[in-house]
């Protein structure tokens, strides 16, 4: 149990059988009446946010999230098969759990998989990946002065904007949080 007076951004609590992460909170002490805490909570599974008001000193259960390191193996058509790096157990993760991050998955990539009450509620991908460019328009000498960009298709199928000097066969570092080209490797 955690007192609402001890809320900090990032603390995970359990409400109505679901895990919520504290996004914002504010202690309010009105001139008349007792103090209360107004919090903005993000549902860890769905990503939706909700505002909730708690009485001062109220205690709520802390949600115990289990984060396990898993290695992505392959896509079986229904989901993404990953292997636990500790006990080598293989599980299939639904496409909904990975969401938009699926376009960055590569074989043998290490993922952080979040479990709540034995169910997968989220997948943390690494912030940066290194991928090979499989298709892009050839760069023309002297095109680098304008800072122009072109599309490049990566080995995972993702398409990113890259500078004109990048060619097919180059290995790039990509920030997958934003989908932006960082550098040639």
From Swiss-Prot:
Asked if the keyword S-adenosyl-L-methionine belongs to this entry, the reply reads no
Q: Which GO terms describe its biological process?
A: peptide biosynthetic process
* Keywords per UniProt: Cytoplasm, Elongation factor, Protein biosynthesis
Xref: Gene3D superfamilies: 2.30.30.30, Nucleic acid-binding proteins (2.40.50.140)
What are the recorded GO MF terms, alphabetically? translation elongation factor activity
Q: Which GO terms describe its cellular component?
A: cytoplasm
- Keyword Metal-binding assigned to the entry: answer is no
Q: Which PANTHER family match?
A: ELONGATION FACTOR P (PTHR30053), ELONGATION FACTOR P (EF-P) FAMILY PROTEIN (PTHR30053:SF12)
Per its UniProt record, what HAMAP family does this chain match? EF_P
Recorded hits in NCBIfam families, A to Z, give: efp, PRK00529.1
In Swiss-Prot or TrEMBL terms, this protein is called: Elongation factor P
In which organism is this protein found?
A: Syntrophomonas wolfei subsp. wolfei (strain DSM 2245B / Goettingen)
